[in-house]
Amino acid sequence: MSVRTSSRSNKGQNKYIEYLLQEETEAPKKKRTKKKVDSATEKNKKSDSSQEPRKDTENVRTDEVDEADEGYVRCLCGANNENYDAAEYSHGDMVQCDGCDTWQHIKCMTDGKDTIDGLMSEDSKYYCELCDPSLYAHLETSKEAEVSEDEDYHDDVYKPVNDHDDNDADVFLDEESPRKRKRSPDSAKGIHIKSKQVKKSNGSKKRNKSIDAAKSDTAENEMPTRKDFESEKEHKLRYNAEKMFSTLFSKFIVPETIEAKLYELPDGKDVISISQEFAHNLEEELYKACLNIEFGTLDKIYTEKVRSLYSNLKDKKNLELKAHVVEGKLPLNKLVNMNASELANPDLQEFKEKRDKVILENFIVEVPDKPMYVKTHKGDELIEDIAEPQEDILYSKDSIRLHNIDSIDSDKSKIEQTHAISKEPSPSTIINEESLNCAFLYPGLGLEFTGYLNYIGVSQKLRRDIFKEAIGDGKLYVEGRLPTTTAAPYLKEISCSRAILVYQLFPSNDSESKTTFADVVDSLENKGRIAGIKPKTRYEKDFYIVPSKGGEIPEILKDILGSHNDERSERFSRMKSDERTLFAFVVVKQEFIH
């Protein structure tokens, strides 16, 4: 067994050297034998002279192997065989790797600790960050490997925009691509040096600095901080963003606006120089907009804004936006704060507006049909009260101009109003004792009129008669519209499981109500729509108003009532061929009727 000792005086000495030397001397030594040389013969003299250079060569090789066996210096702080001097380094003791025989400072490898107990393997051996990288997840390297442009382009952080068939090599940003550590020439050379097997004790091998160096050098150990790493990362991110914007201006924005005669280059400047100037200013404004002033860091939205600006300004259909940017009509500080919808080309904006308009037209507010519960000290209690909702200001009597007089006895009031109307009947309608006064409000068209409802029938038998109760206060407020082609199949299908009350709506005898009534019927009939009314009670699921012209009865009415309601036909008024009318359909949930 051989002992690794340093041939350099300025290196630290292993504290186990004496123990190992003592152990070495106790082992039996091999005797060396020398060959006797016959000086009498000339042949032996020539052989001796020829062997002398061979011995010198062997001695040189032995010295090189001994120096290689001792190991080499390679530490994270930058120390290596070329610049290491114990008097100049104050990083403390060093430790040697059992895999590649490299010497490293203990504090540098343990992030400032004086012991390496946490880095020792199960067999009490120490391995550096190259031999066993899994032990050094806590370290942050002080130097980052340089990444080439090709690697940045293929890091897949910003994917190329394939909206044109161009073959330009765009530059894309890299926000969180892994860093590659490049080994120094000394470190690469030392890994391939063969090491001798040495018997080690359970303790670690340390390399102590000299006493003179400990007294003279008092500088603090400088380690790379997280702030330095973030600054380097942010710098690279901004550099790639500016490079990407420069390509955008030089290959797309400036040439396309010049070709369309929307922009002219300033005197003394070419496309490259003006593109670099625009790119630098745009990146500066984007950095200011995405900088978190409180923490002094760059928000993650920075990379998203770079993608959005690049893809929208590269779009050939967005020529007007490009012209506004290069001409200065759109300031860069406003450009970086525009959202994706504002940056999109006119075709996309028009499509989005049409889509939103269609969604609003088909929107129907659904009334929740779940039972209401109240939390009390006894638990959850179901609310059985079906009281009418509080009157809204939109339903005030002044706005809808109701002509009925409220009374304490509501039944008596309705009877009196029915007799009053029956004295002056309309020549084309029949008013019976079951007619209910109502007011129709259509805020979407700004139309309103007063009238009355005649009850026609119900699709299923109910526990009790609710045809008056279902209308409530008679204020019919239009909440929305939906196509007739959608509503008719729905009413036909739901009539099998739900009860549907059917009414016929007539206007009052005054000319203003009749004119407004005709406008409502024409509007719904021409557009193929039915009106959705706000439900009046908690057991009502849907409330629809269906138009009819030319004296025709809607097919859906026949499908819902069926032949068993033929006796209800006498309730219909005799309509002329040119008469307009409205039918009300109230979908009821029977389980909530008590």
UniProtKB/Swiss-Prot annotation:
SMART domains: PHD, TFS2M
Region feature Disordered, mapped onto this chain: 1-65, 142-231
SUPFAM superfamilies, sorted: Elongation factor TFIIS domain 2, FYVE/PHD zinc finger
Gene Ontology MF: a single term: zinc ion binding
Bias (Acidic residues): 165-175
Gene Ontology annotations of biological process type: DNA-templated transcription
GO cellular component, one term: nucleus
UniProt keywords, alphabetically: Metal-binding, Nucleus, Phosphoprotein, Repressor, Transcription, Transcription regulation, Zinc, Zinc-finger
UniProt domain TFIIS central: residue ranges: 254-365
Subcellular location, record wording: Nucleus
Biased composition regions of type Basic residues, renumbered to the chain: 191-208
Residue numbers carrying Phosphoserine: S177
Pfam families: PHD, SPOC, TFIIS_M
Residue ranges, compositional bias (Polar residues): 1-13
Main localization, broad class: nucleus
Compositionally skewed regions (Basic and acidic residues) per UniProt: 36-63, 155-164, 209-231
Record-linked Gene3D superfamilies: Transcription elongation factor S-II, central domain, Zinc/RING finger domain, C3HC4 (zinc finger)
Zinc-finger ranges (PHD-type): 72-134
Record's function text: Negative regulator of transcription elongation.
Family to which this protein belongs: Belongs to the BYE1 family.
Subunit structure: Interacts with the RNA polymerase RPB1 subunit and specifically with the trimethylated H3 histone H3K4me3.
Domain comment (free text): The PHD domain is involved in the binding to H3K4me3.
Record protein name field: Transcription factor BYE1
Species per Swiss-Prot/TrEMBL record: Saccharomyces cerevisiae (strain YJM789)
